[in-house]
């Protein structure tokens, strides 16, 4: 059985909590995958795909970027930051990658990005 957990990872913007989802296999975790969704998407769009990968022994993690999905604040969809929002997105990906590396040390980590991701 696949476990899906949702939690918040502090954003590098210093104000937001990134809605983060982790799909974990029931058995041994062989590999890790970080999914970076595209513009106007959200991480739960990848739920069926992430579940399939978890069934293959791959732990999958991803978060809603600033201005997307469960991370949207004040209805500002697609908004990252006043300045250098792209830098926040990159730093946030590093934060999420660090989270799963701590949880599963020594496993190879891959990244899948779609469109803006």
Enumerate the predicted regions with their spans.
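Conserved Rossmann-like nucleotide-binding pocket used by diverse enzymes
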Residues: 35, 61, 112
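Alpha/beta-hydrolase active-site loop
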Residues: 81-102
